[in-house]
Amino acid sequence: MKPRQKRLVLIVGIVAAVGVAAALVLNAFQSNLVFFYSPAQVAAKEAPVGRAFRLGGLVDGGSVQRDGLVVRFVVTDTVKSIPVRYQGILPDLFKEGKGVVAQGQLGDDGVFVAREVLAKHDENYMPPEAAEALQRAGASNQKLGETVVKETRP
């Protein structure tokens, strides 16, 4: 082969390899992409059928029913409500009236079967360990509006 033909074959090979790699990356990205839907969107059939998605809203008051590791509750956005079934241990912050995000699929019976449940918290959340450390070490600095830890040395 002439040098020009060799270069052409090399360029075509590189372009083909980059194209295959890009297709594989996009396919992997698309299969791991999980969208967020509100209960109103799920009720309006905007959520994908047979595919995982995230359902977010508030845990409806009085809806939590525990049966061993199986927990049933209702997620609402104050417009529509979707029943959820989850098997596993719930996060410590999971409470009625608080925000929650559940990842899973909508069953044929209209019940959202969650694989994972995440409890949402507001921006003022502080882990219990940090709150205890702050109480032991000192108070908060009200002038600045932020929490300050005072270091004490023996």
UniProtKB/Swiss-Prot annotation:
Q: What is an annotated GO biological process for this record, any one?
A: cytochrome complex assembly
Q: Which InterPro entries match?
A: CcmE, CcmE-like_sf, NA-bd_OB-fold
Q: Which GO terms describe its cellular component?
A: plasma membrane
Periplasmic topology ranges: 29-154
Q: Which GO terms describe its molecular function?
A: heme binding; metal ion binding
Topological domains (Cytoplasmic): residue ranges?
Answer: 1-7
Q: How does it sit in the membrane?
A: Single-pass type II membrane protein
Q: Where is this region: Disordered?
A: 131-154
Concerning NCBIfam families, the annotation shows: PRK13254.1-1, PRK13254.1-3, PRK13254.1-5
What functional role does this protein have? Heme chaperone required for the biogenesis of c-type cytochromes. Transiently binds heme delivered by CcmC and transfers the heme to apo-cytochromes in a process facilitated by CcmF and CcmH.
What name is this protein filed under? Cytochrome c-type biogenesis protein CcmE
